């Protein structure tokens, strides 16, 4: 069992906002305290969790965050059950951050792209938190590295969930040799004011398995891959963004693989982003 403590200054100007505390990875059972009050717990060491501390924060002074992490095996917490064949290192091993949002904000944006020829299809599942009238969602897109966005459209949002489906002309495809990626900017708007903004990186590709193998964008591709665990010698799981990205580069450029299985749990989003 280990403990982590950090003092956090909360300025007065954050009053009336949403303060969202996210812990990206705490192995394996954790309890979170804010100014001595328990505000949450989590029972998995591989998934992120978020707590709203808006009502618990004291503004204009330093607040105290404490995280208690229990790294012992338990049959009630994945991946335990006395059958796993890998080490499950403990502790607070990924980042912790605080997002400052408006009362109504984008809670989740899930984007996926498909491809037919040079025409892309972009499907977005959008979840908002909060309430109010006159809400709309605007989406725009650009190729990564370009300066200007092109508008996809704007749609009224009457509830907390919205699905958008756009056709995007003249796109470049994503594949393992030329991994062209696009930034999708999603904005939550009320009366022409942008309340929140989310930028998601995606690509346009069509993947399918047929009887004779795997096809990417209509071309047969032989998958050469391996399993990847997130542990490192001497340090366990606790490695920064630079090492996560370098590991993906090693797999591609030194080992020559074009596929990786993230065994057996959600891994660092930095590693996943570098694979993209």
Language model: regions and residue ranges:
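N-terminal carbohydrate-binding accessory modules
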Residues: 109-110, 173, 185-253, 273
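Extracellular recognition modules
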Residues: 66-68, 183-187
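Conserved, mostly hydrophobic/aromatic
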Residues: 36, 96, 182, 218, ...
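Aromatic sugar-binding surface patches on proteins
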Residues: 47-50, 158-168
């Amino acid at each position: 069992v280990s403990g982590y403590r950090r003092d956090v200054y909360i300025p007065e100007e954050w009053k009336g906002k949403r303060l969202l505390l996210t812990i990206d990875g705490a192995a394996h059972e954790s309890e979170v305290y804010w100014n001595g009050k328990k505000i949450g717990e989590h029972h998995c060491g591989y998934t992120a969790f978020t707590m709203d501390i808006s009502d618990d924060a004291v503004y204009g002074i330093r607040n105290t965050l404490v995280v208690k992490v229990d790294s012992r095996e338990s049959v009630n917490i994945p991946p335990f059950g006395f059958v796993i064949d890998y080490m499950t290192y403990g502790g607070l091993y990924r980042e912790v951050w605080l997002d400052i949002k408006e009362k109504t904000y984008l809670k989740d944006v899930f984007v996926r792209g498909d491809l037919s020829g040079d025409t892309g299809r972009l499907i977005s599942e959008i979840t908002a938190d909060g309430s109010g009238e006159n809400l709309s969602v605007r989406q725009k897109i650009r190729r990564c590295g370009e300066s200007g966005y092109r508008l996809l459209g704007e749609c009224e949002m009457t509830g907390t969930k919205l699905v958008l489906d756009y056709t995007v002309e003249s796109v470049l495809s994503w594949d393992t040799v030329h991994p062209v990626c696009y930034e999708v900017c999603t904005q939550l708007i009320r009366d022409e004011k942008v309340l929140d903004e989310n930028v998601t990186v995606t690509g346009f590709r069509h993947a399918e398995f047929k009887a004779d193998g795997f096809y990417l964008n209509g071309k047969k591709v032989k998958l050469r891959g391996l399993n990847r665990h997130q542990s490192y010698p001497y340090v366990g799981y606790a490695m920064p963004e630079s090492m996560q990205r370098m590991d993906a580069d090693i797999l591609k450029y030194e080992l020559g693989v074009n596929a990786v299985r993230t065994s057996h749990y959600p891994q660092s989003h930095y590693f996943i982003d570098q694979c993209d």
